[in-house]
Amino acid sequence: MAGVVVVGAQWGDEGKGKIVDWLSSRADVVVRFQGGHNAGHTLVIDGKVFKLALLPSGLVRGGKLSVIGNGVVVDPWHMLTEIEGIQAQGIEVSPESLVLADNASLILPWHKDIDAAREGALGAAQIGTTKRGIGPAYEDRVGRRAIRVADLADPAALDLKIERLLAHHRPLRAGLDLPEPDGAALKAALLEIAPQVLAYAQPVWKLLDEKVRRGSRILFEGAQGVMLDVDHGTYPFVTSSSVVAGNASAGSGVGPGAISYVLGLAKAYTTRVGAGPFPTEQDNDIGKRLGTVGHEFGTNTGRARRCGWFDSVMVRQACATSGVTGLALTKLDVLDGFEEIKICTAYKLNGKTIDYFPAGLTDQAAVEPVYETLKGWSGSTRGARSWTDLPPEAVVYVRRLEELVGKPCALVSTSPEREDVILMRDPFEG
């Protein structure tokens, strides 16, 4: 048995979709364990583009079991729409290939209303939420009033759950100048889709326990990145779930002993979507070039990503909090043609040099990057599949990142194509 967790080691958008797709060829089961449909994956397979947000990336590969774990908040309407979308692209989806945790919490239309109203009220201080109801759904989950997948099979329990929700949401919506919530309409909408959703529902913890006992290879697919973790990220400019690798266990129902390798993904530079501190941001021609060449626009939202140099301090911290075993470095080809490339090796804060990202919001905004400059390369790295295909300067760059982060590179991705990967160590081989 081997369990590999894939987590982003920056602010998300590190190319997890491609790497998970590549690793899924070695896996029997692919599991989503946190987040919702707020983080998109783009997969390019035989020239065909698949855009996923909620569904595990393993679905686009035949012969794999894909699982949505209990740690995910699920918009059931979006789930069904996304299933229909990839079915239209020729992908077979059935209860034999996709399983949904029966104890996963649901995202409701009310959650989206609240998300959008709160974000709009913040004005210039907006966090940058996708307004898809993720945060409010997690609030109801923690508040023990969430509607869960299993409740769709029990109309009597659904009535009680909706009454409990109404007691909380009525005054909340009134304070946000939102219309009175309609419990009857919500129940009718949920019961209408219940048969379709319940067809995929199972006790995922039990299913995965059986897979572990049989020695199956399980790939745990994280969403977002560690620096968006609700505890360890740039709070409050974070997501509403735990993104670190440790949550792969809690968010799927398997014990931590099932995890044998943690793969941390990082771009060869840095990007961020939405507001929040970003020490190495390049709000200039360099940032524009990175964004243009790297096609840095959100899969779900289309929002332009902020771009900057690689921040080894941040990635090292993300690796520490997630227990990363090895790195997968992506988008190395975007740096082709730069005469020089900078790497952040430390921060300056109030005149002192520090080697970590501080927890306080004021300090996070005040840190200044300390850079090391490396020579760039004029040759192309695009499509490289071995070290010998890389310009010498690119090899030096990758090796320097390994030194600064303190983790070896297991994989280097050199294009969006699935097979354009330099493999140093197969995570499933330990």
Curated annotation (Swiss-Prot):
Pfam families: Adenylsucc_synt. One of its GO terms (cellular component) is cytoplasm. IMP binds at D13, E14, G15, K16, N38, A39, G40, H41, T130, R144, Q224, T239, R303. The active site is at D13 (proton acceptor), H41 (proton donor). The keyword Magnesium applies. One of its GO terms (biological process) is IMP metabolic process. It catalyses: IMP + L-aspartate + GTP = N(6)-(1,2-dicarboxyethyl)-AMP + GDP + phosphate + 2 H(+). It is found in: Cytoplasm. Binds 1 Mg(2+) ion per subunit. Substrate binds at T299, N300, T301, G302, R303, A304, R305. One of its GO terms (molecular function) is adenylosuccinate synthase activity. Keywords: Cytoplasm, GTP-binding, Ligase, Magnesium, Metal-binding, Nucleotide-binding, Purine biosynthesis. Mg(2+) binds at D13, G40. Pathway: Purine metabolism; AMP biosynthesis via de novo pathway; AMP from IMP: step 1/2. Its EC number is 6.3.4.4. Transmembrane segments: none annotated. It comes from the Bacteria. Its cofactor is Mg(2+). GTP binds at residues 12-18, 40-42, 305, 331-333, 413-415. The keyword Metal-binding applies. Homodimer. Belongs to the adenylosuccinate synthetase family. Plays an important role in the de novo pathway of purine nucleotide biosynthesis. Catalyzes the first committed step in the biosynthesis of AMP from IMP. This is Adenylosuccinate synthetase. It comes from Hyphomonas neptunium (strain ATCC 15444). The lineage of its organism: Bacteria, Pseudomonadati, Pseudomonadota, Alphaproteobacteria, Hyphomonadales.
